[in-house]
Amino acid sequence: MQPEILVLDEPAAGLDPETKHEIFELLCRIREKRNNAIVLVSHHMEDVAQFANRVWVMYKGKIAMDGTPEEVYSRVEELEEMNIGIPQITHLTYSLIKEGVPLPRPAISVKEAEKMLAEILKEEKPL
């Protein structure tokens, strides 16, 4: 059987971090090799931010947001109003932006936050 669309409901729920990582790596390989669409239902926003290339946010039974992870997670205040969790790194970088750190947008991964902060530090002039 070679389905065009694979629908998974909380595929990593209850798994240890290593096994969860292996599951998501396997799903990425399946998506790339077979060119499948994978619909992932999850409440774990870090997984969604890392795995998805498109995110739909459901709120009160309707699609409230639709976009790339970067687009969706940059709408921090709206997500918080809907009581939707965001990745911890997104929350941290959003807080930095509110404090005046000139990040382009909230980051969705630690690696992305590192790159953004390194770029800012590179642009800083020595005292």
Predicted features by range, described:
Residues V48-Q50:
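A short, surface-exposed alpha-helical micro-motif characterized by mixed small hydrophobic
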Residues E80-L127:
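ABC ATPase nucleotide-binding domains
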Residues L6-D9:
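Catalytic Walker B motif of ABC-type/P-loop ATPase nucleotide-binding domains
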Residues S42-H43:
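H-loop/switch region of ABC-family ATPase nucleotide-binding domains
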Residues M1-E4:
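A short, proline-enriched helix->beta-strand linker immediately N-terminal to the Walker B motif
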Residues P17-T19:
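Helix N-cap at the start of a conserved alpha-helix in ABC-type nucleotide-binding domains
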Residues D66-G67:
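ABC ATPase "signature
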